[in-house]
Amino acid sequence: AQLYGEFKNLFPNNAVEYFVSYYDYYQPESYMPVTDTFIEKDFSMNEEIDRLRLKATSSLLQRKDVIVVSSVSCIYGLGNPKEWKKQVVHLKLDDSISRSSLTEYLVDIYYQRNDQVLERCNFRILGDIFEIFPAYEDKAIRVDIFDNTIQSIVSFDPLTGEEHSEHDEFYLYPARHFISDKD
């Protein structure tokens, strides 16, 4: 964490990202033959570190000036980066997309529909407006679709609803690292 902070100060124009284990607690499964006891695997995941891991991965696909602070053990078992990249949803102003297609894309990349509470890795549909809280961001995006055409893409604070910035395009990355091809 200290190195991450130092690199952010040293390289303010670069995407300095943090990719470490997201477990606050991890107990592997085990067997104690003396007492014939099986201990189940138990763990606790840190949601903020999971967000930072997904942010690091999305930055690697978006930018050329990325510095990732990580431990070596974290790079194993992430799955195929080509498959992950194929799942990215590119939203662009004036592009044609139906409500049902966007809903299907979001579900395919592990976002869950929740029309009540907007939280990380969820989306909701309010008429022709999609509100999506990317897994790797601290801001949500609002996509306004009219007549199957993207009219606007705006980032906003998911708690207050305050709009922050308009986008001409937005790349929406999967909500998990572990994804598979539909086939």
Predicted features by range, described:
Residues 1-183:
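ASCE RecA-like P-loop NTPase motor cores
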